[in-house]
Amino acid sequence: MAKQAKMVVDKAFSISKIDKRIYGSFIEHLGRAVYDGIYQPGHPLSNADGFRKDVIDLVKELDVPIVRYPGGNFVSNFYWEDSVGPVEERPHRLELAWKSLEKNEVGLHEFKKWADAANSEVMMAVKLGTRGITDACNLLEYCNHPGGTKYSDLRIKHGQKDPYGFKTWCLGNEMDGPWQIGHKTMDEYGRLAEETAKAMKLIDPSIEFVVCGSSNKDMPTFALWEDHVLSHTYDYVDYLSLHTYYGNRSDDSNDFLAKSDDMDEFIHTIIATCDYVKAKKRSKKNMYLSFDEWNVW
């Protein structure tokens, strides 16, 4: 017998205004996500820049306010300087995260153009696996500094006079994972993220940071990772990332539909850990969450 669900909404019991970025997404140079996904030159539905107009229209319809780029695991082997300048002069590189070849046809400028067409902001990730502070600062200077310096003038030379002004920056990706190129221990990463954030703020004090939390709650270092990383970075970052993916490998529909409860528990556990570090530091600052990877896999 079918049962009818009922929801009661009382506007007098509002909690807070919803940050529109909760509806954000991310894209990565993985499989056909970029090449043939959003970018397919020569296709009848592609625009003059090679981007699929039908995909752009769908993203606009979804009203995605912010998109994280370029990854994902991809960022740990991403050489941003290879992705700018004349396309025909860009080198091809072995892409080690997903074991493919990166031709750099879609680079920083191209993706920003796509994001503008889709009415989305760019949430830029820096490479803290195989590089570090200097590389992150150079990228920020290229993207956000007005001009008169090596990397801002290089951006201008590449045809982009005005700075991009990217506001939100991710300090690496899933650095707790042994699969990550340049994987770090919790304290190695915490110190690196702290010093990177401090240095980048000297270039652009207006930016905000997302620091890597655990790649999923089943990691053996889960919660300890958040504690140690935030103990280093709490005063310098604004968001802690959460990632999780759900599947139904056991073909159990009831269990699968209950995964939303598991996600709620995950969020509350992270909040408790953030509050613990806040108390430990005697801080008045609240740490916010960036749930920047979640889906059905």
Task: For every predicted segment, state its role.
Residues 226:
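Active-site substrate-binding loop specific to GH73 endo-beta-N-acetylglucosaminidase modules
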Residues 1-223, 231-238, 263-264, 268-297:
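Non-catalytic accessory regions flanking glycosidase/transglycosidase catalytic cores in CAZymes
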Residues 217-218, 230, 236-258:
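Long, well-ordered, tryptophan-enriched scaffold segments
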